[in-house]
UniProtKB/Swiss-Prot annotation:
Biased composition (Polar residues): 613-631
InterPro entries (alphabetical): MPN (IPR037518), Npl4 (IPR016563), NPL4_C (IPR007717), NPL4_Zn-bd_put (IPR007716)
Compartments where found: Cytoplasm, Perinuclear region; Endoplasmic reticulum membrane; Nucleus membrane
Topology versus the membrane: Peripheral membrane protein
Function: Involved in the import of nuclear-targeted proteins into the nucleus and the export of poly(A) RNA out of the nucleus. Has a role in the endoplasmic reticulum-associated degradation (ERAD) pathway.
Keyword Electron transport: no
Native source organism of the sequence: Cryptococcus neoformans var. neoformans serotype D (strain JEC21 / ATCC MYA-565)
Annotated protein name in UniProt: Nuclear protein localization protein 4
Ranges for region Disordered: 85-132, 613-665
BP term (GO), one: protein transport
Length: 693
């Protein structure tokens, strides 16, 4: 016989036999109450067939001496358990009461094997110590600010002096709907949304700590069931452990409000790869977070560089390694370069030449087609799940993500535009639960059909119809992809001040296009050093101009990461290298370059450059002899013919120099176009100029 028991702790199912005694039946009912919940007072326990006072209530002690069979229950009956929580014993655990101002959750009772406390109720999250959560600096900054929107005195409505204030000029809250509408702000900033959630709470320090305002969405079945009244899913499921239905709406806030690219060369680097190969490219954005003043309590991401992972580009897509094997190393190097620098997002190309004019790009992402496809949205959500935001405003210690996605695609004028977005928090939950999948139509998302051992909750989406009424529609089998993301604005600074000044070094993981190697490092560094007569191996003799050129050459993200990953520098020297590469952005760090020049890794690099330059000098003839071998006067000795500039005489001579006699049938090299003339004339067969110069 199956009986359902509904209590303040939830609904549970019990399987009993007609011969089960009343004492065993009462104990089974008590076992459905999780130990983490307030325990009932035995004197107040009562069982009823109707909720509240509407039905007949039977106290628990009346069950003694009886069996379930003679209580009149039928299979599937719903019974209601009522009780009052047991009052805490003031004499018990005095030390706990003295140090803990708030009640602590009860610990699991080992005598009850069916008691589970993770979590105690459906859609709740276990409490954890949030004091150890390290929040980003930008979040710490906005938490200390009032966020009020200052307004000036309104000359039309204000009837007071300059030092007074009224309803027409008092500061507004950062979530003020009228201000949001007047300034066409579609999404609240993250911290403005938090202020809105906390506005109804008392302004105490403990209210935000004890009751975090954000609750991460969970669409997975809770296993094991908190009640412990049935086997774990898929063998059993109840209203306590199954996820609730979800209604999708446009997310009212966004975690990032703006993306700022520090330099146009960041975008140009990706475009140049596409122009040269015709295949798509993807890269991860390296940047930091900062305040954004154009929206109340706004946050922007400043992109300083990109890192291209191992990938195989195609004409209409690409294949990229997952997971990204070098991410932890890149994160470490970025942190050394600048405080707060990390992986903040990804960017990829979706460019197709126009069939009518190959100099223009095809405009395929617009209001009549789609902005982001369902496959792209699932990819964005997956990367956001792997880069959660640490915050004390969520009971789990993290909420959503600030990982952004950018796409380079064609615009209506045939140029290239940037589209930027983030997957919503609901999209992350749906991807994590595995209840959605991509569709052939890029503008819609499919809700998966549950397979064996799977559970997919009901999904709806809400919108306003043509009459302005809010309508709820089932999302199965498909729903628009717009419900799963929020748009983000982007731009470039008016006065660029990038962290990395150079981009001369080749980009990583571009086989066949250009490769990174130590030979490229040696060649580029030697080209800088050879412009001075100073000794290559002694950086102390370099003039200031050379040091400035080397410092600018080092300020290249791709060069820094390459040198750090080659093993030429020790761990400490790698940190010095990163400091030297960004020293121009930190005026107080004046000794980074000198420390690098004095390091062992740098001396080893200079030794290699010096030996390479010496080897090239021995293998290549001097410029003067090279010109003489061609029968041409060296530009360094231009002018009247002298003894030192005369061509070598003897049988090994190749030809006559400029100024030799015009007669004879020997080969003569034209001093203007270097063509070898075999006739005995005085003019060149190719350019027609005189062979005598």
């Amino acid at each position: 016989m199956l009986l359902r028991i509904r209590s303040p702790a939830g609904t549970a199912r019990l399987t009993v036999q007609p011969e089960t005694t009343g004492e065993d039946f009462a104990e089974a009912i008590l076992n459905t109450i999780p130990a983490a919940d307030p325990q009932p007072d035995p004197a107040t326990l009562a069982l009823s067939n109707q909720p509240g006072a509407a039905g007949e209530s039977v106290p628990f002690h009346a069950l003694s001496g009886r069996t379930v069979g003679d209580m009149g229950f039928s299979h599937g009956d719903l019974l209601f358990l009522s009780y009052k929580p047991r009052a805490a014993d003031p004499d018990s655990h005095p030390a706990m009461q003295a140090t803990a101002p708030h009640p602590q959750p009860a610990q699991p009772d080992p005598s009850h094997p069916k008691t589970h406390t993770d979590p105690p109720m459906p859609n709740t999250i276990p409490l954890r110590d949030l004091s150890s959560v390290q929040e980003p600096e930008i979040d710490q900054y906005w938490e200390k600010q009032t966020g009020k929107i200052e307004r000036k005195r309104d000359p039309a409505f204000c009837r007071h002096g300059d030092k007074a204030m009224c309803d027409y000029c008092m500061p507004l809250e950062p979530y003020d709907p009228k201000f949001q509408s007047e300034h066409q702000i579609k999404h609240l900033s993250y911290h403005a949304y938090l202020r809105k959630l906390l506005s109804s709470r008392p302004p105490t320090a403990s209210s935000a700590t004890d009751l975090p305002p954000l609750s991460p969405t969970s669409l997975s079945v809770i296993t094991p069931c908190p009640t412990g009244a049935h086997p774990s899913f898929p063998d059993g499921i109840c209203s306590t452990c199954q996820p609730s239905a979800v209604t999708l709406q446009s997310q009212p806030f966004r975690m990032v409000d703006h993306i700022e690219f520090a330099s146009p060369s960041i975008i140009e680097g990706l475009l140049s790869a596409w122009r040269r190969t015709g295949t798509q490219r993807i890269a991860f954005l390296i940047g930091r977070e900062d305040k954004y003043e154009k929206v109340p309590m706004g946050i922007k991401v400043i992109v300083e560089a990109v890192w291209e992972p191992k990938q195989e580009g195609e004409l209409d897509g690409l294949t990229v390694e997952t997971p990204w094997s070098d991410e932890s190393r890149v994160q470490e190097i970025a942190k050394w370069c600048d405080k707060g620098l990390s992986v903040v997002g990804m960017i990829y190309t979706d460019l197709t030449p126009s069939p009518d004019d190959i100099t223009k790009t095809l405009y395929k992402r617009h209001a009549q087609s789609y902005t982001a496809s369902s496959l792209e949205m699932l990819l964005s959500a997956a990367y956001q799940l792997s880069h959660p935001l640490s915050t004390r405003m969520s009971p789990t210690g993290h909420y959503s993500s600030r990982f952004v996605t950018c796409c380079l695609t064609g615009d209506k004028d045939g140029g290239v535009d940037i589209l930027a977005w983030q997957a919503s928090e609901h999209a992350e939950a749906m991807v994590k639960a595995g209840i959605v999948e991509a569709s052939v139509d890029p503008a819609v998302v499919r809700v998966r059909k549950p397979g064996e051992g799977e559970y997919v909750p009901e999904v709806f989406y809400s919108y306003k119809n043509e009459y302005g009424l809010q309508v709820k529609m089932p999302a199965k089998p498909t729903f628009p992809v717009e419900y799963l993301y929020v748009n983000i604005t982007h731009g470039f600074p008016l006065a660029p001040s990038p962290l990395f000044l150079s981009n001369a070094f080749p980009t990583e993981n571009r086989p066949g296009l250009h490769d990174q190697s130590m030979q490229v490092v040696i060649t580029q560094l030697a080209a800088i050093l050879k412009t001075s007569d100073a000794e290559i191996g002694d950086a102390g003799t370099w003039p200031g101009r050379i040091k400035k050129d080397v410092e600018k050459w080092l300020s290249d993200w791709h060069l820094v990461t390459f040198l750090c990953m080659q093993g030429l520098f020790s761990l400490k020297e790698q940190q010095i290298l990163c400091r030297a590469a960004t020293a121009h952005a930190h005026p107080n760090d004046t000794h980074a370059l000198e420390e690098l020049f004095a390091s062992g890794g740098w001396q080893t690099l200079l030794t290699i450059v010096d030996s390479e330059a010496s080897a090239n000098a021995r293998s290549n003839p001097p410029p003067t002899s090279s010109f003489n071998n061609l029968g041409i006067d060296s530009p360094a000795f231009a002018g009247p013919s002298t003894e030192s500039s005369a061509p070598p005489s003897g049988p090994d001579s190749v030809g006559a120099g400029a100024g030799a006699g015009a007669g004879g049938g020997r080969e003569r090299v034209c001093p203007h176009c270097t063509f070898v003339n075999e006739h005995g004339g005085s003019d060149c067969e190719i350019c027609g100029l005189p062979l005598d110069g």
